[in-house]
Amino acid sequence: MNELTFTYKNWKGEISERRIDVHSINIYYGEVEWHEGEQWLMEAIDLDKNDFRTFAIKDIIGEFSLDFIK
């Protein structure tokens, strides 16, 4: 499976490493319950939680890591 790994700060301020399926990525401008105010969002399957999650692009820390590009 092709995955994208990044460091992310969630709405509670907790920082963790996240892994998502690159084939499930949907990037859009909008607002959702956990990310108030219109902004760029990325929805994707979180491989560790085995469920779709929405990430605020502004809360991604540092660089992305793609497992299939080495």
Spans of features found by a protein language model:
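Core beta-strand-centered patch of the WYL/Sm-like small regulatory domain
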Residues: 1-70
